[in-house]
Amino acid sequence: MVRRITLNSNFMFGASDIKSLPNESAPEIAFAGRSNVGKSSLINLLINSKKAARVSSKPGCTRQINFYSMYNDKFRLVDLPGYGCSHASKDETIQYLGLVEYYLIHRRNLRRVFVLIDSKVRLKEIDKDFIYWLTYNNINFDVVLTKIDKVDRENLDAIIESTRKWINNESVSIRQISVRVKYEMTKVRDEFFKFTR
């Protein structure tokens, strides 16, 4: 049974450039991943809201960094633009990737990055490039496998093992979630809250 949690949360605003980033007064947890991997859906599930984060059936809906304030800004959830968006122009891609890189490198109150991977397609080269980049820049991250309801248990175990072997870092946790069946949500929430203390 999934534990129900009522969260005091609200959308702060979306930052489309460095100057519009909010102050660093509260700890932040960021969610990253390829376009349409399920970041917005996961955020909605974490805070028990169907509408807090905009969910799109088309890749690349999020073109800015969206901030969600929790418990009167005790901490924040951060929805990063999806990388690998085929619908974005070259100029748009350069602009929002530059913003994301700046945020991840310079944000002093960033506690953890959760990298979402679609378990149906496993690690893509663009995911590996992003994880390499995080590692090179000494940015702490964990991996969250999404859409696990679309993969049978045997294949899921193989995906977890291959992902763990490729990352080869014991400090990186690999979580499994399905927004549809809310699998492992209690554990994901516990991991989420741990970094906001």
UniProtKB/Swiss-Prot annotation:
Q: Which cofactor does it need?
A: Mg(2+)
Q: Which GO terms describe its molecular function?
A: GTP binding; metal ion binding
Native source organism of the sequence: Wolbachia sp. subsp. Brugia malayi (strain TRS)
Q: Where is the organism placed in the taxonomic lineage, from the top? A: Bacteria, Pseudomonadati, Pseudomonadota, Alphaproteobacteria, Rickettsiales
Q: Establish whether keyword Iron is in the entry.
A: no
Q: Which Gene3D superfamilies match?
A: P-loop containing nucleotide triphosphate hydrolases
Function of the protein: Necessary for normal cell division and for the maintenance of normal septation.
Name the InterPro entries on file.
G_ENGB_dom (IPR030393), GTP-bd (IPR006073), GTP-bd_ribosome_bio_YsxC (IPR019987), P-loop_NTPase (IPR027417)
Q: Where do the annotations place Mg(2+) binding?
A: 40, 62
Q: What are the EngB-type G domain coordinates in residue numbering?
A: 25-197
Family stated for the protein in its record: Belongs to the TRAFAC class TrmE-Era-EngA-EngB-Septin-like GTPase superfamily. EngB GTPase family.
Protein name according to UniProt: Probable GTP-binding protein EngB
Q: Which NCBIfam families match?
A: GTPase_YsxC (TIGR03598)
Query: For binding GTP, which residues are annotated in this chain's numbering?
Result: 33-40, 60-64, 79-82, 146-149, 177-179
Q: Quote the gene name from the UniProt entry.
A: engB
Question: What HAMAP family does this protein's entry cite?
Answer: GTPase_EngB (MF_00321)
| GO BP annotations, alphabetical order | division septum assembly
Keywords of this entry: Cell cycle, Cell division, GTP-binding, Magnesium, Metal-binding, Nucleotide-binding, Septation
